[in-house]
From Swiss-Prot:
Record's protein name: Cyclotide mech-6
One Pfam family linked to the record: Cyclotide
Domains as described in the record: The presence of a 'disulfide through disulfide knot' structurally defines this protein as a knottin.
Post-translational modification (record): This is a cyclic peptide. Contains 3 disulfide bonds.
Tree of life domain: Eukaryota
Taxonomic lineage of the native organism: Eukaryota, Viridiplantae, Streptophyta, Embryophyta, Tracheophyta
Entry similarity comment: Belongs to the cyclotide family. Bracelet subfamily.
The protein's role, per its UniProt record: Probably participates in a plant defense mechanism (Potential). Binds to and induces leakage in phospholipd membranes, particularly ones containing 1-palmitoyl-2-oleophosphatidylethanolamine (POPE).
Cross-link (Cyclopeptide (Gly-Asn)): G1-N31
Disulphide bridges, residue numbers: C5-C21, C9-C23, C14-C28
Organism expressing this protein natively: Melicytus chathamicus (Chatham Island mahoe)
Gene Ontology biological process terms in this record: defense response
Entry-linked PROSITE patterns: CYCLOTIDE, CYCLOTIDE_BRACELET
Alphabetical keyword list: Disulfide bond, Knottin, Plant defense
Amino acid sequence: GVIPCGESCVFIPCISSVVGCTCKNKVCYRN
């Protein structure tokens, strides 16, 4: 939840969710 994955999730889900990233405030974060 604190490390930006360098991906936005405004229109599509986080592709980086496969490595544990989740959408928060339209940006993908992990941990």
